[in-house]
Amino acid sequence: SFNTAEHLLALQQPNSIKKIIVEVPKSAKFNRNFVKIMVSNSKNIPPSLKKKFKANIVVVYEFGACEYSANVKQTGDYKDHIAMDVGGKPLRSLKIKLKNGNVLNAIKFKLLLPETRNNLNEVLGSVVMRELGFISPETFQVKVDVNGTESIMLFQEDARKELLERNLRREGPM
């Protein structure tokens, strides 16, 4: 809903993102999957319940919004990646793969429940590592709305080619 050429610098800054909205059209199946994870006997999230769902992602900036098609799925090994908010609505850590476009040059990223990464300690750790010259994924706190359930989550880009490019490195053999 805006001319990207006018906002190129702002599109590269995490603080220009006001909110990320995740809409899963098949929300009944998405919620049923959440319940199956909750009631499973294991402390771990069974891999069979980490199903992909088609979703629409809207990234709201100070100056407009961008819409993307995506696949989302449950991420995390342990059940600390799922929770209920005060009103009893489901919260979960998500892995998102955009089918078109990117957010801060990331095509794949995670929206994590803050408790799974010791809240802001993960953000502090990534900033310190970056300042020391290490390659570190873009990590920051952001408002998120998943099917109408609002929460604060951690955005963390996946360790992929875009991470290397952002750190002025090239892909190659190690």
Regions found by a protein language model. Name each.
Residues 1-174:
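Phosphate/dinucleotide-binding and metal-coordinating scaffold of catalytic cores
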